[in-house]
Amino acid sequence: ATLNGIKVNYQIAGSGPALLMFAPGGWRSVVSRWTAAGGKDAWKEMDGLATLSRHFTTIAYDRRESGLSGGRVEPLSWDLYVQEAKALLDLAGAKQAYLLGCCMGASLALAFAVRHPALCKGLLLHWPVGGYLWRKKGHTFFQQHMDFVRANGLAAVVERAPKGENFWMDAEIGPWGSPAAVYPEFAAQFVKQNVEQYLDICARSRDAIFN
């Protein structure tokens, strides 16, 4: 589906009350993180998506700039992430939903509930992140990416992106490395940006998400 102008990979399964799922993994926030194979560090042997789909209508997705979803170079923020989730909930036809957030997804679930309390039937926050160490990690990752861009340029990000897979596994590819690796048209536009303007967007994204 295309939501707010960005391709979003999503999966709706099961029946029952709607359960909007915000996956763990930072910039690896993808549907497969809810499965036994893709989410071993969070779920051990349990296939969370299959289990929950027996009781709920599960709505899971690759968050923008993650997995098979696309992206757009703009200052990232919790508001943008909430807008995407709200559009997905509307697409699913759900009037209300329980919210399940894990890791960074717990922060997004809280942000959604604050902005749309009437849509939230309940919150389940698993393995939430936050605090000084989380902030330090985020700032460090953004700094590594920005230093890489200053030294090597944006074309080097596109070249490295398929090997790095995502920002949380290879900080130097940055938050837009995943769509650059998946979508050639995104990569082609990515390299044409003004570097200084891009670095400013990175800094604003870092501060909005981690400060």
Where are these regions (language model features)?
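Catalytic nucleophile-loop/oxyanion-hole region of alpha/beta-hydrolase
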Residues: S69-V82
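Gly/Ala-rich beta-loop-alpha elbow adjacent to hydrolase catalytic centers
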Residues: G101-G105, A109
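Conserved HGGG/HGGXW glycine-rich cap/lid loop of the alpha/beta-hydrolase fold
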Residues: L3-G70
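Alpha/beta-hydrolase
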Residues: Q143-N211
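Flexible "cap/lid" loop of the alpha/beta hydrolase fold
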Residues: L110, V114-R115, C120-A151
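Short beta-strand immediately N-terminal to the catalytic nucleophile in serine-hydrolase-like folds
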Residues: Y81, L99-G101, H126
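Conserved acidic catalytic loop of the alpha/beta-hydrolase fold
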Residues: D79-A97
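Active-site acidic short loop of glycosyltransferases
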Residues: G14-G16, G93-K95, P117
